[in-house]
Amino acid sequence: MERTIEKPRIRVSADNRAFLETSRLVSACGLNTVCQEAACPNISECWSSKHVTVMILGSVCTRACRFCNVTTGKPELLDPHEPEKLASAVGKLGLRHVVITSVDRDDLDDGGAEHFASCVRRIRETSPGTSIEVLTPDFLGKVGARDIIIAAAPDVFNHNVETVPRLHPKIRIKARYFNSLSLLEEVKRKDPRIFTKSGLMLGLGEERSEVLQVMDDMRVAGIDFLTIGQYLRPSKKHMEVQRYATDEEFQYYKEAAYARGFLMVASSALTRSSYHADEDFLHLKNARAGALAKLV
């Protein structure tokens, strides 16, 4: 693709009072959120709608991926009370759908998998009507980590491949493209009831043919939901944006993904892994029901 640098105008609407109330509750509950740590462009809109993506396992990551704004360094000790605090916060915020993500914790024997599972179980106990989505790291392929979370039975298991295989070595520190696909494939194989989800960023130097190949690979792995968004450089220390995709390109990829059989596709400049995740979960359930009805 031709290198193009032309940043689109992005406007996000927000209810200021609702945003401030969510901000107050997040602070009062002592939550870390990826919304803040990753400098997400959608924070105003999401928090105005009381949609929060919580970040567990601390706020310091053991990796330094070139696209990510989360702090890198030596992580703090795990908070054993975090599952309880998180469950309480979900209740106070009145969340219909909660997304739980984390920093990478390569220093832990299980990569933090048991902590993830504890959070899922505690929310199930205290807010049984809330659907739960986990957005996990790859756990460095640590034995048993994936199965611990599968056993906790989140509604959605999300793990992002982020970019095309050719760009992985310089974009995703320690991560491997096919390890990420294998993680999601095993989730679907071991519990087909769990929706699987993954995401891509555009603007890192990928070619159209490479993006389409990733879609094909994802479908072979049985992934249900694909998100595609524009990479935005968090700071001058991070990877430069190679180009800004047009609305037409996002629409092209959306149509190409649906043609390949994804149940759900979100594709736009502002799309992020958990953007509109509560609404998308309802669409996912309806799409699966519709697909199953056609088989009867």
From Swiss-Prot:
Cofactor detail note: Binds 2 [4Fe-4S] clusters per subunit. One cluster is coordinated with 3 cysteines and an exchangeable S-adenosyl-L-methionine.
UniProt main location, coarse: cytoplasm
Domain Radical SAM core: start-end pairs: 47-263
Catalytic activity reported: [[Fe-S] cluster scaffold protein carrying a second [4Fe-4S](2+) cluster] + N(6)-octanoyl-L-lysyl-[protein] + 2 oxidized [2Fe-2S]-[ferredoxin] + 2 S-adenosyl-L-methionine + 4 H(+) = [[Fe-S] cluster scaffold protein] + N(6)-[(R)-dihydrolipoyl]-L-lysyl-[protein] + 4 Fe(3+) + 2 hydrogen sulfide + 2 5'-deoxyadenosine + 2 L-methionine + 2 reduced [2Fe-2S]-[ferredoxin]
Positions that bind [4Fe-4S] cluster 2: C61, C65, C68
An example molecular function term from Gene Ontology annotations: lipoate synthase activity
Gene3D superfamilies for the chain: Aldolase class I (3.20.20.70)
An example Gene Ontology CC term for this record: cytoplasm
Family matches, as NCBIfam families: lipA, PRK05481.1, PRK12928.1
Listed HAMAP family: Lipoyl_synth
Family: Belongs to the radical SAM superfamily. Lipoyl synthase family.
Official protein name in the record: Lipoyl synthase
Source species: Neorickettsia sennetsu (strain ATCC VR-367 / Miyayama)
Taxonomic lineage of the native organism: Bacteria, Pseudomonadati, Pseudomonadota, Alphaproteobacteria, Rickettsiales
